């Protein structure tokens, strides 16, 4: 009897990661959702072994973004356009917080973001999400597979 393929939930606002991973990193059973709320629903409904999470969500309607637009607007001197961009540019972190707050902090997450110059930021995030991993934009399929294997071990 063969071992089942790991279930990887891709959370992104486009289809790039789904297309790329299914083509170049075969093996896992991939599923995709396009918002944080949908990610939480998918985690509740099925046995997800790993979340592959995008950082930036700039193709999603404002109503589908997690986070407090009023707080983001205040943070950007009352500019609602900058507040909205803040939510878009950091949506992966808002989704990560949402998953942790709803009891899914033990599910390993690969965040598609380059932390190579932000070691302190990554360290801070790992205090809240110990099973947090990352891959940058210029990653090879072999590197993605290695990070997936590490995250699933």
Could you describe each region identified by the protein language model?
Residues 73-125:
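A short, hydrophobic beta-strand element within the central beta-sheet of small alpha/beta folds
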Residues 33-34, 133-139:
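Short acidic-hydrophobic, aromatic-tinged amphipathic segments that line or gate anion-handling sites
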Residues 21-25, 121-130:
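Short, aromatic/basic amphipathic alpha-helical patches
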Residues 117-125, 136-152:
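C-terminal output helix
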Residues 4-16, 21-25, 32, 39:
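Conserved acidic segment of CheY-like receiver
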Residues 15, 32-50, 54-63, 67-68, ...:
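Acidic, metal-coordinating helix/loop segments flanking the phosphotransfer/catalytic sites
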Residues 8, 30, 108-110:
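Hydrophobic/aromatic residues located in beta-strands of well-ordered beta-sheets
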